[in-house]
Design a protein with these regions (language model features):
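Flexible glycine/proline-rich
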Residues: 9, 28-33, 37, 42, ...
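Helix-rich terminal scaffold detector
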Residues: 1-9, 177-302, 306-312
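Generic structural signal for well-ordered, non-membrane alpha-helical segments
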Residues: 4, 8-12, 28, 32, ...
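Short beta-strand/loop turn elements enriched in aromatics
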Residues: 28-32, 53-79, 112-127, 327, ...
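Short, glycine/charged-enriched hinge/interface segments at domain edges or termini
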Residues: 2-6, 62-228, 373-374, 389, ...
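Residue-level signal for inorganic ion chemistry
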Residues: 15, 60, 151, 187, ...
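Intrinsically disordered, low-complexity, positively charged segments
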Residues: 4-72
């Protein structure tokens, strides 16, 4: 690493720009019911007005407003009821002047009628009806296209489809939608000290927590994952990287990325001809992170320390992968907000520092009652329940409870 570490802002911009230059994910058409959480591959537009006709929002009577003039409980207006309309009916004829139509919620407004009087302001008659209030033109009418106009964009390309999107699309008659094919991410945990979960423990060994945690987080966001593990051997690492790059759209490694005697990832990337995008970030934890492109695919090399890996995964790898997967950029980036810190952090921060935390209701709490031990980059358990990172700017002293702090919320 010959260049000075770049700022967190520059690192994020660099990986997003690199992701935007990669080939677009291929589209696939799937059933609407299976599309929740998927990314729209093209604009999804309204095929028709919604509602498709003027309709009633309540049970009552469709009327000519002019026929209701002067109506009150003291001087009711009486009209013949000439038709009854339920949701799903199509009016067979126009409503003549001087007549009423019994109408139920959701039923189409008959031609000629220009208002609806709720049944609570009538005697609820079936053959004739007494009106106890005057009604203005267009009162109590839900108009055609009032919710969605034909041709309107319901979900722009790159939108993550939610249950609400699916409901609107179903109301437009969509049975299938075209979405981006999910990217497959290769996860490679490096380290001769690693054991696969379930293997017998041996002295000097640790279980591969990073691989499981990183893979789970990516699956949570809709990625397919292939997970591998290997020893600190540059030839083995190179072979595993090539293998994963053959089958996957991106690769994330953990471990072997710093300046130790067995930190081989920088050499492996150089050997494979990768184009470095980020060569270290000026922050703690996770400063040794590398980001590169190789054969039109993203590669992120993260620290082997669990929290350092988790933090840089959230800050840089996930935004870039989501961008490459077809998401709109604004939905790829951790949202920033300001919260009140409920407990303090006693260490000064010479450089940019990120602390795992839990934000809720405008307040943010550090794990371990703010004890600095809970924020070791090697601490695993302190990540449980966390949903954000607290940003402590370079040059800050100890942070006291009650301080307003910048918070980066994990992308969902």
């Amino acid at each position: 690493m010959n260049q000075p570490f770049c700022s967190p802002v520059k690192a994020l911009r660099s990986v997003l720009d690199a992701a935007a230059l990669l080939p677009s994910p291929s589209p696939e058409t799937i059933p609407l019911e299976a599309a929740c959480g998927r990314i729209a591959a093209a604009d999804l537009c309204a095929r028709m007005d919604q509602p498709p006709f003027d309709r009633s929002p309540l049970d009552g009577y469709a009327l000519h407003s002019a026929d209701t003039a002067g109506a009150s409980r003291e001087t009711p207006v009486t009209l013949p009821v000439v038709m009854k309309l339920y949701a799903g009916d199509a009016p067979a004829a126009a409503l003549p002047a001087g007549c009423a139509a019994r109408i139920m919620t959701g039923a189409p407004l008959p031609e000629g009628a220009d208002c609806i009087l709720m049944q609570e302001l009538t005697d609820s008659g079936e053959e004739t009806v007494q009106l106890y209030a005057a009604v203005k033109p267009l009162q109590n009418v839900v108009f055609r296209g009032e919710d969605v106009a034909a041709g309107a964009v319901i979900a722009p390309a790159g939108t993550v489809l939610t249950p609400a999107h699916l409901g609107v699309l179903a109301g437009q008659g969509y049975a299938e939608v075209t979405v981006c094919r999910p990217l497959t991410v290769g996860i490679l945990s490096t380290g001769s000290e690693l054991l696969a979960p379930g293997a017998p423990w041996a002295p000097g060994k640790i279980y591969d927590a990073n691989g499981i945690q990183n893979a789970a987080r990516l699956r949570q966001l809709g990625f397919a994952v292939e997970r591998q593990q290997c020893s600190d051997d540059p030839e083995v690492i190179t072979g595993k990287m090539q293998e994963l790059l053959t089958r996957c759209d991106a690769v994330i490694t953990s471990g072997g990325v710093s300046v130790g005697q067995k930190d081989y990832l920088p050499l492996v990337l150089e050997k494979l001809g990768a184009q470095l995008v980020v060569e270290g970030v000026a922050q703690k934890p996770g400063s040794p992170m590398l980001a590169a492109t190789l054969g039109g695919k993203l590669v992120f090399c993260l620290s082997g320390n669990p929290f350092a890996a988790a933090a840089t995964l959230e800050q840089y790898a996930i935004p870039a992968l989501l961008r490459a997967a077809g998401r709109r950029e604004e939905s790829c980036i951790p949202a920033r907000t300001v919260c009140t810190l409920t407990n303090g952090f006693s260490k000064p921060s010479k450089g940019n520092r990120y602390l795992r935390a839990t934000a809720c209701g405008g307040k943010v709490t550090l794990p371990g009652a703010g004890n600095t031990e809970a924020h070791s980059s090697g601490a695993l358990s302190a990540m449980m329940g966390c949903n954000c990172l607290v940003e402590i700017p370079a040059g800050s002293g100890p942070v006291e409870p009650g301080t307003e702090v910048e918070v980066l919320c994990f992308v969902q």
